[in-house]
Amino acid sequence: INATVFNQDIGNWQTGNVTNMGGMFTRASAFNQDISNWQTGNVTNMASMFLEASAFNQNIGGWNTGNVKYMQSMFQKATAFNNGETPGESNHTMDWDTKNVGSMANMFSWASSFNQNIGNWNTGTVTSMVSMFRNAIAFNNGEAPGESNHTMNWDTKNVTSMASMFQDAKVFNQNIGSWDTSKVSTMIYLFSGATNFNNGDAPGESHHTMNWSSGSLESMAYMFYRAEAFNQPFGSNWNTASVTNMSYVFRDAKRFNQNISNWQTGNVTDMSYMFGYATAFNQPIGGWDTSKVTNIK
């Protein structure tokens, strides 16, 4: 840890018996050696493995990750990492087996060069995706900015938090409208600053419904704050009955103008700046129950 000058060839190490690689190259800011041939089949922990390893950019897409349970912060602030490619390019597939991973929180946060197609990862056991792509400013699941053909077919049925998942992921715009979000309790800042996100549609268009279920949702504060392209309708499973905080939800969402008159707001206490500078919004919400709201400025 903090081996800031280390950059020696260790590609031939025998790692077949290693079970824990957590934090291995944390803040190893000079390290960028080929370790693609490492045997990782017994590793269960890769959390923070390349945290702030700001020079590392090798192709490790062939690693065996079938037993890994922890990947949180694995590439957090690994600003050069794009699986061996130049920033934003997407020809080095990461076909990792992630079926046992429980946490991907902060996995690519501030990984500002990363843009590989990981849409087929098995995420069925993941419970936390907090800040997973926060400030991953090049990430669009292997596509160029503005494109939206690489669907992320993720199984999200066990995820409980998506807070800040795509916050400031400025070019991301894939269709994720069919994700199962029934267990997610917090979506705060989820798409905040994701200025190109419109669920795979062109900016301001409204053909890709967000068919998310939200029966467990309690807070959606700042969810679409500064999501300037977003303008999709919400499907029939969108349930806000348990939500208490809707502050800043659509602030600066300049294109949003969908009918949300059926939202259940009976438990909401904070609606501050909910539509601040949402300059296109003009829908009938006069029937909302605001009896518990204490902050509505």
Labelled PLM ranges:
Residues 1-297:
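Negatively charged
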